[in-house]
Amino acid sequence: MKKILFIVYFALFFINNSLADTKAEEREFILYAKLPIVPKISILQISTNLLEIDKEKFELKFNIKTLNIVNYISSVNGDGLVLGIIKSNNYYPESYKYEYTRGNKEKSVYIEYSNENIIKEIFTPQFDKNKLTPITNKQKTNTIDPATLFLRLLDINKIYGCNQDIKIYDGKRRYDVIFSDKELTKHGIECSASQNRIGGFKKDKIDPLTKADLVKIRYEDSTNSRFLGFYAKKGLIEIIIEEVH
């Protein structure tokens, strides 16, 4: 009898999981840097693997690694994992973990959330917060991690047509992404944005008003909302993120 019950339970478990509505998507992006007269050069590769389950849960695995000359000057290679929920057609993290090697130093950050509030933070190694501009617990409320931010930026509908500002905290830095304008062009839609630094930046190097001169996020159109690229300019330096197709 016990054996029969076990078989029935196993069969039901298998059927339920087989019928789960899952969506998997792998994508790859390249970050380029460009100076005047000099062709753009790829300096960073971002790989993502997104799994959505029953339109209620999501799992985002990602890898970030430096390329070309940057890999020799200041190499970075890291893997991350975000587990979260999908509500109101948007992504909200429940946990964020990022482990990476910068040069010869291994580092990691772990953030856990509950009801959009941070309930746990673990850093390896620990860093001296006294050298950084302060961040209060209240300023961490309703924040998301940078990987979830990137995931939202890939779909114009996830940023509500460029009409909602986003609060970000990566375990050290706290900043806002503020959308200011949406423009229809012959190539699609361009969203203008800026960064407002709240805290967690080096005291001797931070200017509260410092930001890129120009930030644009580009989408094909509002119908399919396909991400076309990210463009930023600060002084003579241009930063471009494009998807590899």
Please give the residue ranges for each predicted region:
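Sec-dependent N-terminal signal peptides
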Residues: 4-14
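Sec/Tat signal peptide C-region and signal peptidase I cleavage site
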Residues: 16-20
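Acidic, serine/threonine-rich low-complexity disordered tracts
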Residues: 21-113, 156-245
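Hydrophobic, well-structured mid-protein blocks that either form specific transmembrane helices
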Residues: 107-146
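A contiguous pocket-lining binding segment that forms or flanks enzyme active sites
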Residues: 140, 144-159
